[in-house]
């Protein structure tokens, strides 16, 4: 049986990514949780990202208001929950870039 990450890496288009993310996800809560799971799988390898041009530690991902995937970041003693759209991931692979575009498209209501 394929792992979720293996299946995610087989997606050839943004539409494929969105369809895979939302398989068996009904309602806003389930869709948000499904996206959170996919984002954690695809971007869990990153421990450093940029927010507003500053390098910060990426501690993980979470949901805001139950519907938006956010990044949990830390710089020194300060911790922030940041919209995923505001996070710059270094050296994205083409599939990672595709999944990030898919999330952005879906989160803007275009998916």
Feature locations, PLM:
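Residue-level recognition of beta-strand microenvironments
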Residues: 59-61
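A short macromolecule-binding patch
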Residues: 78-88
